[in-house]
Amino acid sequence: WKGFTLPGGHVERGESIVDAVIREMKEETGLTISNPKLCGVKQFPIDNGRYIVFLFTADKYTGELISSDEGTMHWVDKDELSSVNTVSDLNELLQVMLDDNLSEFQYVIEDGEWKMILK
């Protein structure tokens, strides 16, 4: 992916989800985050199941932002997001992450078409 997206990754065997968030942030950004908070879930159907993404926020960190094998890292102000190339559903992801009345971002397939639902 050549545009802007959020850091992400996977949970390793035996690792807690929170520990995976802390590890992935360190690996991808160079930042050590404290007290990540689960703020939403994104899910979509795959072959015989579904893929689930846990969305976290963290407001405390130490370290300096660095680039990694994942790409060049930059801070982007929320007001500037509309002027940069982002993943197509970044606005909806941020909406779920920042709106206390939302907790789920779901893709469903209806009549052969992908549909986005925010709950």
Please provide the spans of the model-predicted regions.
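C-terminal regulatory/oligomerization modules of transcriptional regulators
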Residues: 99-119
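Active-site-adjacent beta-strand/loop module that shapes the phosphate/pyrophosphate-binding cleft
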Residues: 44-64, 91-97, 101
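Conserved Nudix-box catalytic region and its N-terminal flanking loop in Nudix hydrolases
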Residues: 1-26, 112-119
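NUDIX/MutT-family hydrolases
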Residues: 66-97, 115-119
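Short connector loops at helix/strand junctions that flank enzyme active sites
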Residues: 6, 33, 49-53
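Short aromatic/basic micro-patch
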Residues: 5, 55, 75
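A short coil-to-beta-strand element that immediately follows conserved catalytic motifs
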Residues: 32-40
